[in-house]
Structures are given as structure tokens and as C-alpha cells.
Amino acid sequence: MVPALRYLVGACGRARGGFAGDFPGASGLASGRPRPLCGGSRSASTSSFDIVIVGGGIVGLASARALILRHPSLSIGVLEKEKDLAVHQTGHNSGVIHSGIYYKPESLKAKLCVQGAALLYEYCQQKGISYKQCGKLIVAVEQEEIPRLQALYERGLQNGVQGLRLIQQDDIKKKEPYCRGLMAIDCPHTGIVDYRQVALSFAQDFQDAGGSVLTNFEVKDIEMAKESLSRSIDGMQYPIVIKNIKGEEIRCQYVVTCAGLYSDRISELSGCSPDPRIVSFRGDYLLLKPEKCYLVKGNIYPVPDSRFPFLGVHFTLRMDGSIWLGPNAVLAFKREGYRPFDFSATDVMDIIINRGPAGVRAQALDRDGNLVDDFVFDAGVGDIGNRILHVRNAPSPAATSSIAISGMIADEVQQRFEL
């Protein structure tokens, strides 16, 4: 097993032909592709794959791309419950390419973020995807924040983040004339990108290599096929049945789940542990009015408070030229609930800001109610558990780290499933 991998990650591959049964959103495969691991026919109501990835967000799609490029003979499908890909956490975040400064040295977050940021910049250049390496200031505004800022700087150096500088008030003013601060960390390798555009590019790569993406497929059940229990030929070739809420079925040999906000529930559907549980937090953003955008030149962050799993309310540039302020973090009463029950405008909103969008992010909790800080990957038990890998906790910086995560997933899938 990959040495640093505590539990395990998801995978992907390439589809074995067009979808029978007129499934919505099905994307087929050109003829003449290599033979998959197993032969077998498709009926009008089922399709079969070597590997199925549940979840069409950036981690699932990056993993699908990585596996199909590594194993072009595998039949692999991606299942997504929405009509479009990458519409939840992937499409509702700040769009920041993180440098890797925040995370505990030697943690998966630290390693994968530093690697992933470099890989992401390279990928965007290759694909012509717009991004800006605009940098970031992490600013201490009170004297008591300076020791934490200095410790964060040392952590960044330990993690191998390049170009970090501690700067004083005069240099802060040179970079951000309207920013008040005593000391700051200058992070020149931080950037911004539209992560949904990146995810859709991963999906295009996957499909171009022969993979199939099936949207409007909300998973209701994952179980061993009855034929596999009787050891019939079909049951042995494709022993796992994935059913959706419409009663349609997919058969496969192996499953990788990258279900984001529903990672615990999908795990439980397959008979695996529901822990760690996912608690959803809604984050609301405000938008600087266009005439006030001159106040902010780049990303500006506060010194993070280690008591909380979030980085604090910050100013973030966007690819469209707008500037976001946020997010806050409040308990969401629905896993995909992007609107609060009510909203009261304040005087300051009339002056410099407009109401902005919201996002919902998944935060894992262990059985004792403690926040789970690092990436968590899991495998099940028993016959079905041996054929399933779960991404259980992939919070920020998972988008930045997505290409690096996908490489780890591809390694682990290859080893576990003996591909």
C-alpha cells in the first residue's frame, strides 16, 4: 500500500462501449478499443464495467482520468447524480490554488497540496485553461497574532513551499496599499482558477480516452449480485450491482466512491462503516462592488485560528475580475443547502459590498465528535468491501491537490485490485 495512505482513495478508468438502455447523460466509446479485463454482454437494462467511480466532482474526475491514461484497456464509468458534472463543492469554492503553507508537516494535505499545485499549474498551461498566479498575503493585524504568523511561516518552509517571505508594514503597503497590518507572509505561488472548468477538462480527457460518464444516476444501493453468491459466470465477472433511484443497474468488478457531501452515506449503502460522519457547513460570500475593487490587489487572508478547521474570512480575486469576501462557516441544515433561511442587510452592504454566492463544504467528524483534519480514505470488509475504495474526507485543499490525489488513487487501485 502507498506508505502515507491511512485508509484509501478512489479510482477510474474507461468505459466498455456505449450505454444500452438509453440512460440519460450516457457517453459512449468508439469502436476498436482494447479488450477489458472481462468479457460479457450488456442487456437493455444494464451496463458492465471493470471499475465504476461514484461521484463526478473534481476528485472523482481527476482519478478517472489518471486511471484510464494508465490502464487504457479497462472499462470504466463515472456515475453522477446531477444532470451536470462538478456542480457542488467543486463549483462552489473560492477558486484558490493553495501553496501548501497551512498543513501539518508530513500530512497528506501538506504533501499532496505542494505537489498538486505544481501539477495543476502545469496542466492549465498545457490545456490553455486560464489562471492567475496572483499571490497571497497572510496578514497579522494584532501583536498577539505575530507568533502564530511566524510559526505558520516556519511550517510553510517545512512543507517545501517556495518563495515565502515575512514582510513588514512598509512592504505590505507596497503590495496592498489599503491593507492594515503589522506583519505578513507573502505567498507568491498562490493562484486562482475556475475549478469547474478544470474538472470539466478532466472529464473531457477521460471521455476522449474512451471513458463513459453517466449523469442523472443517483445511487440508491450497492450490493453483491445474487449470481456472484451462486458463482455463476456473469456473477463472477461483474459481482457488484449498483442501482439508482429509477431502478436502473450498473454491473462492475470494482467501485471507487468520491461522493463528497454524501461520502458517509454512500459508504453505508455498500455495507461499510459510516464513520467518519459528514457535517455540512454553508459558507456565504460577499462581493465587492465594482467601483470598490481597487481596494484589493490580490488575495488577502487573516492569520488562521487553530481552534477551527477553516482559514478565516478572506478577500479572493476571481477569474472574472470580481473580488469575493468570505466565506463564513455556519452549520448547513441541508447537505446541498446554499440559501439561508433569512437575510438582513447591513449599512456596510449599502456602501461597498453586494450579496454574493454560497457554497457548502463537507467536514468529517469522528465517533467522538472531533473534527477530522486530514484526507481520509477507506476500504470495506468482506466480499464487497474488498472490491470498494472510499474517499471519506477530501476537504480543502482537495481541488488544488486533485491531480496529486489522482496519482495516489491510481497507485492504490492498481495494487489493491491487482490490475
Curated annotation (Swiss-Prot):
Example of a GO cellular component annotation carried by this entry: mitochondrion
InterPro entries cross-referenced by the UniProt entry: FAD-dep_OxRdtase, FAD/NAD-bd_sf
UniProt entry tagged with the keyword Chloroplast: no
Residues with the N6-acetyllysine modification: 104, 173
Cofactor(s) needed for function: FAD
EC number: 1.1.99.2
Location of the protein in the cell: Mitochondrion
Catalytic activity: (S)-2-hydroxyglutarate + A = 2-oxoglutarate + AH2
Keyword Flavoprotein: yes
Protein keywords: Acetylation, FAD, Flavoprotein, Mitochondrion, Oxidoreductase, Transit peptide
MF annotations from Gene Ontology: 2-hydroxyglutarate dehydrogenase activity
Transit peptide segment: 1-51
Superkingdom of the source species: Eukaryota
Classification via PANTHER family: L-2-HYDROXYGLUTARATE DEHYDROGENASE, MITOCHONDRIAL
Annotated family: Belongs to the L2HGDH family.
Name of the molecule in the record: L-2-hydroxyglutarate dehydrogenase, mitochondrial
